Swiss-Prot record:
It is an enzyme of class 1 (oxidoreductase). The lineage of its organism: Bacteria, Pseudomonadati, Pseudomonadota, Alphaproteobacteria, Caulobacterales. One of its GO terms (biological process) is terpenoid biosynthetic process. InterPro entries: Dihydropteroate_synth-like_sf (IPR011005), IspG_bac (IPR016425), IspG_bac-typ (IPR004588), NO2/SO3_Rdtase_4Fe4S_sf (IPR045854). GO terms for molecular function: 4 iron, 4 sulfur cluster binding; 4-hydroxy-3-methylbut-2-en-1-yl diphosphate synthase activity (ferredoxin); 4-hydroxy-3-methylbut-2-enyl-diphosphate synthase activity (flavodoxin); iron ion binding. This is 4-hydroxy-3-methylbut-2-en-1-yl diphosphate synthase (flavodoxin). It catalyses: (2E)-4-hydroxy-3-methylbut-2-enyl diphosphate + oxidized [flavodoxin] + H2O + 2 H(+) = 2-C-methyl-D-erythritol 2,4-cyclic diphosphate + reduced [flavodoxin]. Its EC number is 1.17.7.3. It comes from Caulobacter vibrioides (strain ATCC 19089 / CIP 103742 / CB 15) (Caulobacter crescentus). Pathway: Isoprenoid biosynthesis; isopentenyl diphosphate biosynthesis via DXP pathway; isopentenyl diphosphate from 1-deoxy-D-xylulose 5-phosphate: step 5/6. [4Fe-4S] cluster binds at C277, C280, C312, E319. It holds the Pfam family GcpE. Converts 2C-methyl-D-erythritol 2,4-cyclodiphosphate (ME-2,4cPP) into 1-hydroxy-2-methyl-2-(E)-butenyl 4-diphosphate.
Length: 383
């Protein structure tokens, strides 16, 4: 099998915090499990067909877990159909009405997300815990800076990391007092500084898995930057077991950005990682249009691979050394194609995109075939 060129190491190896492992349906979260990527639907949950269509789009993008809001009885009624047909585990998002949590557990939710700031009294939380236990659901204690309990706001004067962590730990104790330990916690704010400070403090205080995110981060550009800074800082420190990038955009973009963050830190790889120069007067072809076309044409590839698209020979050969496939612009309307870091053949700029797509698809098929062969050999050896 060809050498793995997908991993670009950070300056130091990341040592992940040792958290307790739980399950969200078929997906393990925490411990040594891969860091999962999730998103949330923005359709009306009562419209089961529309919600399922969006879930399928998220599944195709690589989502491990999908959260679905359950604000009313109509939503939890539709949830049963949605959960039955979805391929990924679903988290039911519960606010204000604890009975929606009980209904969602009965309808097939893999996890219940509750907000301590608005779920109600400990007795109501107890009833939700019992429903989760009865139906094999895990739970997420989801604390948001914008919806903290009144007494904590009075105590601290304003939303702050200390208040968020205290809220989370108070509700963790309620779950633990009822001998329920299949839970994870999030402490999110729209300010990356507040978010990171809260998670750092929480990571020292409890061993449960942590769901990372910067809430209400903004539209695609600003939200991506905030999330990359906040989530990236925590992951680099080894904190975090599952992530959700919150964007005011198509939920599929959240999955793409989430995987890009993990790929940038060498924590998880999915699809083609395209390395491209910003282009300048030396470019031998239109780098920007080429990369845009390749991103669209290669979106269906889930096999981890790396591809460098560099406009000239200043950095092109060096970048190609570190990628599975590379293309470097040259003169006379042609460039050099690199395979596994070595010059392989020349290719004219005309037809270059089709040629690169063909090379990537063939390489992905080779990698998958070799992987299947290795797995078959391991199965035989284990028998």
């Amino acid at each position: 099998m060809a050498a793995d060129h997908t991993h670009v190491r950070p300056w130091r190896m990341i040592t992940r915090r040792q958290s307790r492992k739980i399950r969200v349906g078929s997906v393990e979260v925490g411990g040594d499990a891969p860091i999962s990527v999730q998103s949330m639907t923005n359709t009306l949950t009562s419209d089961a067909a529309a919600t399922l269509e969006q879930i399928r789009q998220l599944e195709e993008a690589g989502a491990d877990i999908v959260r679905v809001s359950c604000p009313d009885v109509e939503s939890t009624a539709a949830f049963k159909t949605i959960a039955r047909e979805a391929k990924v585990p679903l988290v039911a998002d519960i606010h204000f009405h604890y009975k929606r949590g009980i209904e969602a557990a009965q309808a097939g939710a893999a996890c219940l997300r509750i907000n301590p700031g608005n779920i109600g009294s400990p007795d109501r939380v107890r009833d939700v815990i019992q429903a989760a236990r009865d139906h094999g659901c895990s739970m997420r204690i989801g604390v948001n800076a914008g919806s903290l309990e009144r007494e904590l706001l009075e105590k601290y004067g304003e939303p702050c990391p200390d208040a968020m962590v205290e809220s989370a730990l108070n509700h963790a104790r309620i779950l633990q007092d009822h001998d329920f330990h299949e839970f994870k916690i999030s402490v999110k704010a729209s300010d990356p500084f507040m978010t990171v400070a809260a998670y750092y403090q929480l990571a020292e205080a409890i061993d449960c898995p942590l769901h990372l995110g910067v809430t209400e981060a903004g539209a695609t550009r600003t939200g991506t930057v905030k999330s990359a800074i906040g989530i990236g800082a925590m992951l680099w420190a080894g904190i975090g077991d599952t992530i959700r990038v919150s964007l005011a955009a198509d939920p599929v973009e959240e999955i793409k950005v989430g995987f890009d963050i993990l790929k940038s830190l060498g924590l998880r790889h999915r699809g083609v990682n395209i390395i491209a120069c910003p282009s300048c007067a030396r470019q031998g072809f239109n780098v920007i249009k080429t990369v845009e076309a390749l991103e669209e044409r290669l979106a269906h590839i889930s096999t981890p691979m790396s591809l460098s698209i560099i406009g000239c020979v200043v950095n092109g050969p060096g970048e190609a050394l570190m990628t599975d496939i590379g293309f470097t612009g040259g003169g006379a309307g042609a460039g050099m194609v690199y395979m596994a870091g070595k010059p392989d053949h020349k290719q004219s700029n005309e037809g270059m995109i089709d040629h690169i797509v063909d090379l990537v698809e063939k390489k992905a098929a080779e990698i998958q075939a070799a992987k299947a062969q290795d797995e078959a050999a391991q199965t035989v050896a284990a028998e």
